[in-house]
From Swiss-Prot:
Entry keywords, A to Z: Chaperone, Cytoplasm, Ribosome biogenesis, rRNA processing
Domain observations: The PRC barrel domain binds ribosomal protein uS19.
GO biological process assignments: maturation of SSU-rRNA
Quaternary state and interactors: Binds ribosomal protein uS19.
Family, as annotated: Belongs to the RimM family.
Protein name listed in UniProt: Ribosome maturation factor RimM
Organism: Bradyrhizobium diazoefficiens (strain JCM 10833 / BCRC 13528 / IAM 13628 / NBRC 14792 / USDA 110)
One term of GO molecular function: ribosome binding
Function: An accessory protein needed during the final step in the assembly of 30S ribosomal subunit, possibly for assembly of the head region. Essential for efficient processing of 16S rRNA. May be needed both before and after RbfA during the maturation of 16S rRNA. It has affinity for free ribosomal 30S subunits but not for 70S ribosomes.
Lineage: Bacteria, Pseudomonadati, Pseudomonadota, Alphaproteobacteria, Hyphomicrobiales
NCBIfam families: 16S_RimM
Amino acid sequence: MSALVCVARIGAAHGVRGAVKLWTFTEDPFAIKRYGPLLSKDGKRQFEVAQAREAKDHLVATFKGVTTRDEAERLNGIELYVAREKLPATDEDEYYHTDLIGLAAVTTDGEPLGRVLAIHNFGAGDIIEIAPPKGASLLLPFSNAVVPEVDVAGGRVVVALPQEIAGDEAEER
């Protein structure tokens, strides 16, 4: 089996007929219906979306076989996964977060910075979190100016540290 990629998280029950709040991590929230059965993290449980409708910042969905509020409440917090090969190919300069996490981060001079820990989006654009070998994580804009090169096959991202951060590092040395 190929690597699994998290595409959604089940939230609280919604109503009394087995519906749940569903937060999707896909560009098109309704894409999760096209991936076929979704899997639990361990791959042992399958979930098939029966219906989904848009809500404020999530979907309200029902799964086949889940018909009561009690059943829906037991699903709260479960992350849903699909096999990596079921996801569509990315365009140039587009990446799945899962492909970036764990890559080595180096400066434009080739100096090691650490590893990509996560990609966040707090509403104003993507942020790349880099965990250095010691010290606090670096949170940087994930833009072409700050991350001019992403080499997934080579296992690294190149980071052009903003002057404020580069200057802070120079003072610490």
